[in-house]
Every structure is written in structure tokens, then in C-alpha cells.
Amino acid sequence: MARDFKLIFSISILLLLLDCCYGGKVGVCYGRSADDLPTPSKVVQLIQQHNIKYVRIYDYNSQVLKAFGNTSIELMIGVPNSDLNAFSQSQSNVDTWLKNSVLPYYPTTKITYITVGAESTDDPHINASSFVVPAMQNVLTALRKVGLSRRIKVSTTLSLGILSRSFPPSAGAFNSSYAYFLRPMLEFLAENKSPFMIDLYPYYAYRDSPNNVSLDYVLFESSSEVIDPNTGLLYKNMFDAQVDALYYALTALNFRTIKIMVTETGWPTKGSPKEKAAASSDNAETYNSNIIRHVVTNQGTPAKPGEAMNVYIFSLFNENRKAGLDSERNWGLFYPDQTSVYQLDFTGKSNGFHSNSSGTNSSGSSNSWCIASSKASERDLKGALDWACGPGNVDCTAIQPSQPCFQPDTLVSHASFVFNSYFQQNRATDVACSFGGAGVKVNKDPSYDKCIYITAGGNKTKATNATALTSSASTPRGNELLQWILKLCLMISLFFSLQTMNSQAL
């Protein structure tokens, strides 16, 4: 018995380690509100070509489900709002739906989530309290009957409008008018270990209030921080602030264990006249590139540092039949002919830079560098240097003893190298070289000897000290290697433990 306990304990520890090292996942939303899209089979080929492994669809279309068969792509399917009434009224209806519309394609098609309703609290035609939770329960019951309730998770997606307050994040609170719906929904999620699914769009905050919200702040490009006065936590982007507001709102209702999954986020490439300043290809490329890198490197949020999060980018294609402003039809990553609207690396491993050339704060180029200002005080330089090497996520290895940029061993020299690394990593924008006035842009390359000052457009492979560029990109690959090693250890442990148990039994 003691040996059996040790075996179980060892396996549990290994599984825990495996779970801890898994990184955040980036998926894409495959909406089909268009009359010019390629066939589902061609769409699947496109998705595979771009190494996309997680996809959300908004219904359970048979052609789409069949197309994803034998691909290993994890699929999130949806019960549309129009089906909620029927799903909430009859368990037999849901059992029949599962039998006829889902099970014929499972497990060949790797379905992992079912969303019951989409932003139903924003739909004037849906009574969320009457339909959503009962429909979720009926879907779960149907899954339990066929033994799939642990393999396919059930949830519903909501918008940020579910909050009555989102700033400061620590004051995040749910809208009391939804209390009758939220409590049973959250109890369902907690009991079944399902994620809280939210659609987040910092784009709208900037579009609707450009004079009060910084573009760099919503694009993950801000060199300054917004402080939460209640917690002292510092926020460099709006996405993290919105996610933490949700975590605090959940905590206020004593639902601390529920994980958050972002089922939609993105940025449009075109818009109506009122959206022209915000909606652009440059801004879309910058936002989506940065959110992907943010997720796969497990940065987490200030309130949940290092915590993995799954995020789905909206949307795969421009959808020409969507109603509303021009931007509604221009969120796509690809045109209907399957060419890219802009370049995007879904793995987050690319070392490339995506210059936000259309932004009002962007004037950087491959011929610009950022160095320490000769007018800056020692105190300001020291503070900016410490910040860049810490919260600023710059790899400062090159200025350590025996490294290429350690000499001359002066504060100005070290700060100059670090300032430039941060500047280039953050799209070489003017604000990325401010450092509270301690930084200044120059057009002459400050590189010397083997100390290479990188540029956004330069050849980074020749820079012997350009580790800051690759540190974030190497994290996912390092996690993959660690996962493989731990899995190998688990298999070896199981093999020898079973051998020992068999020999003792004999």
C-alpha cells in the first residue's frame, strides 16, 4: 500500500509540473457572415499553413465540422442565441442535437468547448436568465450521458458590458442588473471547472475616447504605466487592466478559482470616418502581434503574473455581410482569396518587428537609435535603467561584467544600450525613447567594438549581444522542451514502477 501511495504521489507531482509549464494558447475566430469565403476544406488548409491550432466557430455547421476532421486542430463550437430557447426547454432536444449534430464528427474532429449563447446579455431578443443557464445545464447533461463531460467543456461568452466598473482594476464589479443571471452561471462554471469566457476589445475604448486613452496603451506599446491606487499594481496595457478587472469582480463574488478565457479580441483594418484614426492595418498588426507574444510568453497580468491564458483573435476573414459600421466588416486577418491582410506569426516566436507607421506616436525607423540624454540626472538614469531591466522586459545580460557592452563601465553607457534595446523592441516609437526625459533619439549608430546596438530593421543575427530580442521568442520553445522532458520522465517512472509492482506480485 505504501509503495502504491508513493507511485500515485510521484505521478501527481509530475502531472502538476507538466500543467505548470504549459503556455497560453492563441486561436482564431472563424466567422462566416460573408458570401465570398472559401470552402471549409480550403479554410482548414489555410489554417494549417499558418500553424493555427485552436479555432472558434459560432455554430455547429456539418460541413465545417467535417472539414476539421483528422487535423488535430482543437475546435470550439457554438450554440447560437437563436437556439437557446429550444435548448433550455427540453433535455430530449439537446440529447438529439448532440447525437445528430456533434457525435458523428467526434472525436475525429477534436471538439473541446461548446459555447451556449454568445454575448447573450447584449442581445435584446434573449432573456439570459431564462435561457442561457438551463441550456448550459442541458448540454452538460447530454455530454454526461455519453461520457464526454470532462473532455468537452461547456460555457457561454460575454462582453465587457457585464461589468459596471472596470477601472481601477481592483474595483472591478459586475453589473448588478445581471445578478440574477450571473450567480447561477458562475456556480455552473465553478462546479464544472469551465472557464469564464469574455470578448475583450481595447480598440473600442480608444475609438470612443481617443483624447483620454493613449493609443500606445491599448497597443501594448506604452513606456509609461497606469497605477491602480488600491493595490499599487502597474499596468502597461489596457488588455491586462480589463482582464484583472474581471478577476477582481469574480473574487468579489467569491469565485476565485474560475479561469478567464478571452474568446474574442482583435483590431479592425478599416473603418468609417469616425473610426479612421483608430482602424488601420498598422494598428491591427501591432495589436495582434503584441497580444500573441504576450500570451505565448506567459506574462500574465499584474494581478496574476505568469498565469497562462487562452486567447482567440477575431477574425479569420473580413465578413462582408455583417451589419453596422465599416469596421464590422474589416476585422479579418485574411482576404477571401486567402491572401494575408497583414503578416502575423501565430506562434509568437518571430523576432520580426511590426512598425506602427500610421500611429501618431510612431516616427521610428531602422536609422534611429535611443541613448541616454546627457542632460538627464544620475537618479533619473538609474531609475529608468532599473525599470527597463525589470518591468520593461529588456534582457540586460550584455551590460554585465565580461559581456560585450560592460565597458565602459558607466551609468550613461549602460543606460544607452538598455534604452535602445527597449526602444527597438517597442517599434521604435517616440514614446518608447522618452524614459521621462532621460532618453534621446539619435541618427548615428552608437555601436562600438563588439557591442552592437540593434535596430528594428537591422540584421539581428549579427548582433552578438542581441539576446533581448530573442528572449521572449525562446520561451515557448523552452516550455515545449521542458514539457517533452517531463513527459519522458513520467513514462519512465510509470514503466519502472509497474515493473516493480509486477515483480512483487509474482
Swiss-Prot record:
Annotated SMART domains: X8
Transmembrane segments: none
InterPro entries xref list: Glyco_hydro_17, Glyco_hydro_17_plant, Glycoside_hydrolase_SF, X8
Keywords: Cell membrane, Cell wall, Cell wall biogenesis/degradation, Disulfide bond, Glycoprotein, Glycosidase, GPI-anchor, Hydrolase, Lipoprotein, Membrane, Plant defense, Secreted, Signal
GO biological process: carbohydrate metabolic process; cell wall organization; defense response
Lipid moiety-binding residues (GPI-anchor amidated serine): 471
EC number: 3.2.1.39
PTM note: Contains two additional disulfide bonds.
Disulfide bonds, paired cysteine numbers: 370-433
Active site, renumbered: 119, 264
Glycosylated position list: 70, 127, 175, 212, 356, 361, 459, 465
Main location: secreted
Catalytic reactions of this protein: Hydrolysis of (1->3)-beta-D-glucosidic linkages in (1->3)-beta-D-glucans
Membrane topology: Lipid-anchor; GPI-anchor
CC terms in the record's Gene Ontology section: extracellular region; plasma membrane; plastid; side of membrane
Propeptide: 472-506
Signal peptide: 1-22
EC class name: hydrolase
GO molecular function: glucan endo-1,3-beta-D-glucosidase activity
Subcellular location: Secreted, Cell wall; Cell membrane
Gene3D superfamilies: 1.20.58.1040, Glycosidases
Family, per entry: Belongs to the glycosyl hydrolase 17 family.
The protein's name in its UniProt record: Glucan endo-1,3-beta-glucosidase 13
Protein species of origin: Arabidopsis thaliana (Mouse-ear cress)
